[in-house]
Amino acid sequence: MTTELEIDDRKEEEAQIPGETSESEEGDEPVKMNRVKRACAMAAESLKEAKRIKNMLMEEECVLQLGNCKKTASYGHRLSKTEACCPSCFSVAFRGKDYENEFTIWKQKAMDGQTHVRSEQFVKRYVNSCFLPYYAKCHQCSKYSKLITSDSLSAQQLSDFKCDCASTIESPKIERVREDSEWCFNEFGHPPLLQNNISYDLLVDHYVTRTTGMDATCQEKAALIDNGGIEFRDTRRIMNMFYVPFTDVIANIVHPEFMETDEKFAFPKFADDPISIYYLQVRNTIIAMWLKHPFVELTVKMIEPQIIVRGHARIFFIEHLIHPILEFLTIKGVVNYGAFDFRIDPLNGMRPKIAIIGAGISGISTARHLKHLGIDAVLFEAKDRFGGRMMDDQSLGVSVGKGAQIIVGNINNPITLLCEQIGIKYRNSNFFCPLIDENGRCFTLERKELDDQVDLHYNNVLDAIRNKYQSDRNFPDVPLEVTNFRHFTEMFSKMSSGLLSAADLDSLYTPEFEKLLDFHLGNLEFSCGTHVSNLSAKDYDHNEKFGNFAGEHAVITDGAQRIIDFLATGLDIRLNCPVKCIDWGRDDRKVKIFFENAEQAAEEFDKVVITTSLSVLKSNHSKMFVPPLPIEKQKAIDDLGAGLIEKIAVKFDRRFWDTVDADGLRTEYFGKVSDCKTDRSLFNIFYDFSGKDPNGEDTFVLMSYVTAEHVNLVNVLTESEVADKFCATLRKMFPSAVINPLGHMMSHWGADRFVGMSYTFVPFGSDGDATYNQLKKSIDEKLYFAGEHTIAAEPQTMAGAYISGLREAGQIVMSLKRDSATFE
């Protein structure tokens, strides 16, 4: 085996003959001389480095002390920046009679899919894994002690370790590692691989362990040890934060083998291979701990015992990486978010004044995350209640959301996690949605083939439209009108094998086919809060290009307002404070807020977060901001659509809508197939909100909605008249049922000047990504924007609004933390 010093000796010999040139250079003397100079410089530098390492090894003690140890590492092998071994120990470790068998067994486990290995590096990996001592940190005095053992240590053992504090003296090398933030930048040692790591069981089935920085030979003792007083429970059904190869990308995941762009920006020294493995090892450990127990705050003290590796590497991880990486992931809202107690410390002693306009979920999310990060904020809410569009009604005996109540995809969804943290009940929805026409006929059960054919055709056409715009960026945008749907079918018939040819369209588009197609278009209008003629064919579903939350949809049966009430605890929320003007152009870099109530004094702040709805911005931005917002921001506000739906719920004396499919799935919602095209946005889907009232009595409630051309129905008719239309529709769908309404409730978001909408949509002619991204941009590090209208990947949802609040809180902290938002 060739040692490093032998390689260096050859470099020294080569450096003594720098003037040699190849025949191809002889014809060009200047070029030849330049090359000679460069070669001389490189050789001299190489010689200098070789001598430095040689001298260093001559002075160092061998860390292994095996067999016939030479005591010093002269002519030996460097294992890390501060650890080396002599040639004798290095050879004994894998060739000696006492260790050869162990090496063979270790090698079989360690190959881990490898067919070829670099022998010296592979042996270094073996030495790192089995021979280097552990360094345990005393939980009382924080001094490090060397522990020599052939057995691997567990997180519990490292957590419990206590030294004889008075007599323990750390070696100079330990001090050196403590002080050297670039200790890992060493080209000779093998990167340490984590043992008994908590992320192992999450990654082993999908990745080669060494590429994620784990030791495949030593993972039997991985375990969480600190539950923070809350019982451990399985969260895999709601969380999966590591990307699984060859599967669809979902929201809120990371790739365990690669750093994200913002991670590279924050930790530029670790941005490139192979050094990035050090960052990834700590990051993956932290995320795995959060994934397995997201019910208490992750702290440095909890993470330290989970970083298990032999040698000085463990000191480096603990002293230089855990804290900044945990801080970064916390600020970004990747971990340590939600509804539980945090240990709050002021950020670097700073006390900036932060105002948040609007106390809906995005505003409350911003304020709560800031508070977790050590910064207080004041929320100004125009209404006499907080919560925004998360508002429940209990008048019918069960919780019915006037606004948001549906979790759209429950895997990695922060709303699902909030429910779990708080203890709020939610019910996963099945996908059985029977379609019933106004003659009482259930297409899903009686005409299943036609129902499936229409569903396939509808989705194929939309897929063809999406594919066309993806393949041809210059293809002009058009409105996604119902009158164009048949045109789209003809236009894209050749793009999808699932579409019929134009010659078959007349036989395809029967009256029943078109009625079922209208149901799907009506459902699309509900999803966007507007008529399909207003939607961009190019970008109506622009968020589908991002990873969405996976899993089933769910209904928050306890009501979404409980989430808001919990998150708002301890925050400074000032109700009945409508804002009149925000002066952000002052020379002193302060932002001054004026209120509609003339008796309320104006207040100055360092930073202001605007979380009002898009509808409010559309109506007021021209007079609300002084000076006016940048033209690009104004255009984005004008370009994005403010969708609107209104909800109606009615209580009945019995559950008359029981329907089951062939698999016995009970109906949780059902669709109405209208005879008239214009009625498809009138009570398109009915949701079952039945449950127990506070007295434990069965309560039967259906909820539906109006949108598009029918959305103003709740304002032009009385609530009783709207409820009568609701029941009249149900009587047509269930002609033999006895339908006795006992009460009703409905929303009036469109008439609320402090809300004015439900959720956003991308109108014809707008660019979805550009518009959402412009809306989220901060201005001059003084004005910040949050809300579902500012998040391109998850608009229209509680989760999107909540995440936008975490995002802006993180942006504020990053701007305050230091001029350069790096964590090294």
From Swiss-Prot:
Molecular function per GO: FAD-dependent H3K4me/H3K4me3 demethylase activity; oxidoreductase activity
Cellular component terms per the entry's GO annotation: nucleus
EC number: 1.14.99.66
Predominant localisation class: nucleus
Catalytic activity: N(6),N(6)-dimethyl-L-lysyl(4)-[histone H3] + 2 A + 2 H2O = L-lysyl(4)-[histone H3] + 2 formaldehyde + 2 AH2
Pfam families named among the record's database cross-references: Amino_oxidase
Homology family: Belongs to the flavin monoamine oxidase family.
Name this protein carries in UniProt: Lysine-specific histone demethylase 1B homolog
Organism this protein belongs to: Caenorhabditis elegans
